[in-house]
Amino acid sequence: MAPAIVMSNYEEEEIVRPVADFSPSLWGDHFHSFSVDNQVAEKYAQEIETLKEQTSTMLSAACGTTLTEKLNLIDIIERLGIAYHFEKQIEDMLDHIYRADPYFEAHEYNDLNTSSVQFRLLRQHGYNVSPNIFSRFQDANGKFKESLRSDIRGLLNLYEASHVRTHKEDILEEALVFSVGHLESAAPHLKSPLSKQVTHALEQSLHKSIPRVEIRYFISIYEEEEFKNDLLLRFAKLDYNLLQMLHKHELSEVSRWWKDLDFVTTLPYARDRAVECYFWTMGVYAEPQYSQARVMLAKTIAMISIVDDTFDAYGIVKELEVYTDAIQRWDISQIDRLPEYMKISYKALLDLYDDYEKELSKDGRSDVVHYAKERMKEIVGNYFIEGKWFIEGYMPSVSEYLSNALATSTYYLLTTTSYLGMKSATKEHFEWLATNPKILEANATLCRVVDDIATYEVEKGRGQIATGIECYMRDYGVSTEVAMEKFQEMADIAWKDVNEEILRPTPVSSEILTRILNLARIIDVTYKHNQDGYTHPEKVLKPHIIALVVDSIDI
């Protein structure tokens, strides 16, 4: 980021602005127009209904099969992305499995693969099952038996199961180390598709992956399986393509809205990432019933990105102080106090939330927009504090930094906004979220520390000293490497908190909690290998976006 001297009409003086050199959008006008082929969509929908009935019958029949067969069927249906059609049936099956043998005494649990799949599925569905099920695979010294190293499928699912661990579950920590070591050794010698699955899993665990991304990958892998279920595979392909049509339609709406705002021309200092913003929303919820929610959340992410860059990459303290105050007052009459460039984003922000209120009033839910506004005011107030630190060269203590930075992670705002378009989200859910429950704080912490690790070098190059890493280094007199290790440790702890908070009993439904879990998953994918995939989407996000909203699956 190179400083630039510009003349401001707001105040007759030369102002040095740290103008950012963000790369342009990768997508141009690619997504601005899309029309659904209704004939194809109708054809897909009709066949899906038939396949849906057949799959439901298959699930019912599975109740009379072995435990291993039940679990494998549920796992395949979930990984193919069609489980949302059968939520009640799957929940009933898992509940029966859990209640029928709560101590896992069935002989089938002596199989590592069966035990691992069962443990992960039950944990992911909120059952607080004990990891002691894996003690039967350890020797007298409490070490995993070396004889297991030939069971690659079992090791792969043990690895996946280890990622749902919570605090003080040492056996799962050991399971992770044990499985990774043997899978890495075995990977070069395996045949496809198992070799591909192992390599992919070691790069991105299932539990921490974005569901829609993982579904697209698994469909291609499952097609290579020798003993695949052709009915389920065809169902998954049709459903993926039909849902993709809806996603393309929504992205077209968001892209046109973004183009009409013309921020690329009027606010050239800011990131042009509308497509990446929509990608995030597919990570939060991909199912068709969340269409309105996705569009609302995508627009909010795009808007907060503009506000963030205004504070971080362009504004000066005097301007930012007035901008912050105007947003706290949330009144269009405040616009005349602002410099010209700030008037643009201020009006767009207020207009957006007015649109939300009008849209939600149709369902009698306009009152919940208040909670999203309050989160917007909160994050802007915290942005101002960070902006002052940067401009004035102030370095806070790490505790002072984190107390402010959890809000600027954006996850308080985005989680609240993610509920706006969900008809099932009640005022009580927003009230619960406003208390900053443990799972929300964990998510914000995860987002903050992972972002800080990924952006440290860039921010250091801009002269930013009030970063989390720098604050920790100064407070504790340690090296950059040690500080980053500490922040990674904080991320690991946050993940355990998230995993723990989705286990029953829970204060809200799994539908509500899953949005928070999915936001955590987005961080794991977007900042893979300490890269800021949002600011620099070329390597990290571009392939996923192409897979999700450009390329359909060959039927």
UniProtKB/Swiss-Prot annotation:
Binding site for Mg(2+) 1: 308, 312
PANTHER family: OS04G0344100 PROTEIN-RELATED (PTHR31225), SESQUITERPENE SYNTHASE 31 (PTHR31225:SF253)
Residue span of motif DDXXD motif: 308-312
Pathway: Secondary metabolite biosynthesis; terpenoid biosynthesis
Enzyme class: lyase
Cofactor entry: Mg(2+)
Protein name: Vetispiradiene synthase 1
Source organism (scientific name): Hyoscyamus muticus
UniProt note: domains: The Asp-Asp-Xaa-Xaa-Asp/Glu (DDXXD/E) motif is important for the catalytic activity, presumably through binding to Mg(2+).
Binding site for Mg(2+) 2: 308, 312
